[in-house]
Amino acid sequence: INRYYELFREHGIPVGQVLTMKENFATRRHYLNQKNCMTVMLENGVIPIVNENDTISVSELMFTDNDELSGLIASMMDAQALIILSNIDGIYNGSPADPASEVIREIGQGKDLSSYIQTSKSSFGRGGMLTKTNIARKVADEGITVIIANGKRDNILVDLIQHPESTLCTRFTPSPEPVSSVKKWIAHSEGFAKGELHINYCATELLFSDKAVSILPVGIIDVIGEFEKDDIVRIIDFGGKPIGVGKANCDSTQAREAMGKHGKKPVVHYDYLYIE
């Protein structure tokens, strides 16, 4: 933090350290408390420097790496853009070590990148390009521009802002559809899920249509785990694939009682449902 303090002081900008834990994103109340804290800092001209509180974080609930933390913060603060710095220039269409490989400059929604991603970790931390890509895609789907660039290049941040077209990087195109603050919170809550809702083929098809669809009991074929009302649950399609998360509108006992029946209230309402 002293390094950031010295760097920003040269420009007359105060900074403040914010230590957080993954658990602080588990409930909506804690989530909003963090957002309000950092909003007040920014309104008073103080730049938050956010890091994980390693001294008290439970290992099972630690962030995967700082890329995951940055994605959560960008989403929570409704940022215009997220810049993730790595030790390479972006995502390549082949191995970065291959001279014939080129940086993919623009990545649109739905583009399959599985054949391009290396699993080796960055020298900057414990995360690799796979983590960076997963976070970038999720945050871009929430309407935030995401850029992956080389943090070892001199003046990279200045160049990205002042010369975006000529600066080598990978840019993830943001979704044009607005995403509510609640859905942004839910989108990053998969790690806190207390149970699962398994849905049938028809329900799965409807969720991926253009309609605003809630998860009704008639489309549920199984309820796994024990959860309370307002807990986070995973949504599993008819083939066993996780496709999203949502906030339960009832507890697991009520969900099992209503499962497969018509005319019942939603188990997960559309407003509290995030589909990948």
Cite the ranges covered by each PLM segment.
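C-terminal catalytic "cap/lid" subdomain
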Residues: 1-276
